[in-house]
């Protein structure tokens, strides 16, 4: 733990669980809202829980929809900000599987693996305004066959949006809080209009907050959601939704352990002290203990010898503090859907979608000089550092559909998914002036002076599934099915070291890689022993597609390295087995489950350079397997008409089964028998909630056990306990009827702790790997909400 000097206001975001209920039958994807949180998924042949969108309203204003899933067993979600919406430092782990090994959808539309520099989707925080989430469904382990994902090795999260209301209405919410946080949310529902019963909704959200570490960084988000529903008779309807997002975020700075101790818990970027950033870059370029005329830090020649070679205290390297970094994202995603019944025995669903994204990751880098840095007469583009923007854009479109046959005891479902994705990625460098910062990290930059390794990608995804849900008698449900998928990705280098290249040119590379398996089976059952007890079990297999992005398998280094990787590696694969018990009493619900997972063909990259900043080409290899064993238990108690309690406990033992070896047999990483990095073994969640219709509130406790950010487990991160609080009041009479005031406080006890990581590393015996984010301090927010 760390000692910090700030004392903030007191009040936090937590999930109020009043009104929690448990499903009596398999949860169906209806459009009707629910005011309950479904924990146990009664009747399902696998672990499935559904959380209502109302739960998000008790979280901090604008919190990520994933925040409402934190209380579920096996879920480890953490980040550097109190909202969980800052993507670079938000971390989701489910039963030992990382976020990029899970699947995510919104109204069935794929969101990709939700990685930060996403190549095939976007984060749910940008895909929809959090207040517009109707519900979120979590399927652990074998996941769902119908999930439109090719990364769901460890489970899937399906989000569903609120439909427009049948009557006219409006919602307005205003929020304010620590770090100058302010947020507006507004939504208008037209109600049914016209002779066809059309209904629509329009929503807008505008958020601003300062970065809590130094209050100089700024984070803004603007989102627009439009949805239209058109009934077609009594048993069919069409829907159209379009969601736009503009996000401008200054970064939180990751640190090493020794940097946190030396620089302090609140250490961050240098902005607005640009001259200090220039000085640190000059000094870094002057350090030359090797005596070869080039910097030991940057590899550059000296840019200002008069600056000397001694860093001013407390700084000891150019990596201790950069001037600024940011993430810029513009997204537009939309879908047209048609669902309904063709007859009493035949249901169908069809969806067409598209998504465009433009992104840039600005960073004031001291490792590259501006083009005129060595010209003493220059007054522009003459700084000893440069503005680097990792830039990318993509356009993807696709369609998915399913058809359900009700054949009495058998429910047959057949579905498919197709997607085409065209993208472009590259590192682009822009000049900076020595006298002042002439570029804004929160604005897209154009006309670079240098472009390094720009790639064009083309990816095609095809997937289908078929399943039979058989109920031979009322107490027994059996599920049989399988899915098949093929993902083919081409990557062609367009620019090599600032030179446009084409086939036949030196430096040009091309790689096509496929992941394909047309039989990935899944089995499951649920058996109701009596009115109170039920057992369930499942087994399933999943395959992950290769990520198609810069530095990936087919877009990395030389043609020889790409050809070697394509010929050598296999896609990652998981096999999950699960057995559980559900119990339902008068005022109690309970769940116990055990699972076992075989995760094979784990993929890793070896780098010839040890520099975390300037990376040479990678060598990709499958490096062995992971075996996971775990148990989960959940208890819900309805203590009175107004008071409820929830406790969940998870134990997950995920271990590497092999050491990582290089091609010549030498040891690279000693991982055999080590715990999987980034996954705590113990998780404990507890919540107590009160709601009498007017006064409401909740106190939430979470314990995350020790975890590792190194593969060799040589530097553990301490366990942490956190408390969150929410309290509010609904007005039900007079002019204030329909109004609500609430207060949220995150990290109530103001704990200092390491929360997340930007990357996992081989080992860190000296604590100098700069990959850790500290957690946000106590933060308080007040929200006024009015419904009309």
Task: Locate predicted features.
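Membrane-embedded beta-barrel scaffold of Gram-negative outer-membrane proteins
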Residues: 186, 337, 341, 345-353, ...
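Acidic/polar loop-and-plug regions of large Gram-negative outer-membrane beta-barrel proteins
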Residues: 229, 237-333, 362-388, 437-449
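Face-selective signature of the C-terminal outer-membrane beta-barrel domain
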Residues: 311, 315-318, 328-362, 379-496, ...
């Amino acid at each position: 733990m760390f000692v910090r000097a700030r004392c903030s206001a007191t009040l936090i975001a937590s999930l109020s669980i009043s009104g929690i209920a448990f499903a009596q039958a398999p949860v169906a994807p209806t459009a009707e809202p629910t005011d309950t949180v479904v924990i146990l998924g009664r009747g399902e042949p696998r672990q499935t829980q559904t959380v209502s969108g109302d739960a998000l309203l008790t979280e901090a204003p604008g919190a990520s929809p994933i925040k409402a899933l934190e209380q579920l067993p096996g879920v480890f979600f953490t980040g550097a900000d109190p909202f969980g919406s800052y993507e670079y430092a938000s971390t989701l782990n489910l039963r030992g599987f990382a976020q990029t090994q899970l699947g995510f959808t919104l109204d069935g539309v794929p969101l990709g693996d939700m990685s930060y520099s996403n190549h095939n989707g976007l984060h749910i925080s940008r895909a929809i305004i959090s207040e517009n989430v109707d519900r979120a469904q979590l399927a652990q382990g074998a996941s769902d066959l119908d999930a439109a994902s090719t990364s769901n090795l460890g489970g899937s999260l399906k989000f569903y949006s609120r439909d427009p209301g049948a009557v006219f209405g409006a919602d307005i919410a205003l929020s304010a809080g620590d770090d100058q946080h302010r947020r507006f949310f507004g939504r208008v529902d037209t109600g049914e209009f016209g002779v066809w019963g059309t209904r629509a909704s329009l929503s807008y959200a505008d958020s601003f907050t300062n970065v809590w570490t130094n209050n100089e960084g700024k984070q803004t988000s603007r989102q627009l959601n439009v949805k239209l529903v058109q009934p077609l008779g009594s048993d069919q309807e069409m829907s159209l939704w379009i969601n736009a997002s503009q996000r401008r975020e200054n970064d939180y700075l990751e640190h090493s352990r020794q940097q946190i101790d030396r620089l302090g818990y609140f250490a961050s970027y240098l902005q607005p002290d640009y001259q200090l950033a220039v000085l640190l870059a000059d000094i870094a370029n002057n350090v030359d203990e090797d005596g070869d005329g080039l910097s030991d830090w940057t590899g550059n020649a000296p840019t200002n010898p008069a600056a000397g070679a001694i860093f001013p205290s407390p700084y000891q390297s150019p990596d201790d503090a950069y001037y600024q970094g940011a993430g810029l994202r513009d997204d537009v995603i939309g879908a047209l859907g048609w669902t309904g019944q063709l007859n009493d025995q035949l249901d169908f669903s069809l969806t067409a979608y598209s998504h465009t994204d433009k992104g840039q990751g600005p960073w004031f880098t001291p490792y590259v000089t501006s083009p005129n840095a060595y010209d003493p007469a220059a007054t522009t583009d003459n700084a000893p550092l440069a503005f680097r923007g990792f830039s990318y854009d993509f356009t993807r479109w696709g369609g998915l559909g399913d058809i359900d046959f009700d054949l009495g005891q058998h429910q047959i479902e057949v579905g498919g998914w197709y997607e085409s994705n065209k993208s472009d990625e590259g590192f682009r460098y822009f000049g900076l002036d020595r006298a002042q910062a002439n570029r804004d990290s929160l604005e897209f930059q154009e006309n670079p002076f240098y472009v390094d390794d720009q790639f064009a990608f083309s990816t095609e995804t095809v997937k289908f599934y078929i399943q039979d849900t058989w109920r031979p008698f009322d107490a027994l449900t059996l599920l049989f099915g399988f899915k098949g998928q093929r993902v083919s990705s081409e990557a062609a280098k367009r620019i090599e070291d600032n030179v446009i290249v084409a086939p036949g040119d030196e430096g040009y590379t091309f790689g096509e890689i496929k992941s394909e398996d047309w039989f990935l089976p899944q089995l499951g059952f649920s058996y109701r022993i009596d009115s109170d007890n039920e057992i369930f079990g499942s087994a399933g297999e999943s395959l992950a597609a290769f990520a198609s992005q810069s530095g990936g398998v087919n877009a990395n280094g030389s043609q020889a390295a790409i050809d070697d990787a394509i010929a050598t590696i296999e896609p990652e694969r998981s096999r999950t087995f699960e057995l559980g018990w559900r119990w339902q009493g008068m005022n109690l619900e309970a769940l116990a489950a055990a699972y076992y997972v075989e995760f094979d063909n784990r993929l890793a990259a070896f780098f010839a350079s040890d520099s975390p900043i300037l990376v040479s080409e990678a060598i990709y290899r499958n490096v062995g397997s992971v075996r996971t064993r775990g148990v989960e238990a959940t208890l819900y108690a309805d203590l009175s008409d107004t008071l409820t309690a929830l406790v969940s406990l998870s134990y997950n033992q995920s271990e590497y089964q092999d050491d990582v070896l290089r091609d010549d047999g030498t040891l690279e990483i000693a991982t055999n028998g080590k715990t999987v990095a980034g996954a705590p073994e113990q998780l404990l969640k507890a919540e107590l909630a009160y709601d009498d219709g007017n006064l409401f509130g909740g106190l939430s406790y979470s314990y995350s056990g020790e975890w590792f950010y190194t593969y060799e487990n040589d530097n553990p991160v301490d366990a942490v306990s956190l408390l969150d609080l929410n309290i509010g009041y609904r007005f039900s009479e007079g002019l204030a009827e329909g109004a609500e005031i609430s207060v949220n406080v995150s990290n109530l006890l103001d704990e200092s702790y390491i929360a997340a990581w930007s990357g996992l590393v081989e080992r860190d015996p000296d604590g100098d790997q700069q990959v850790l984010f500290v957690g946000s301090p106590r933060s308080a927010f007040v929200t006024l909400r009015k419904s009309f």
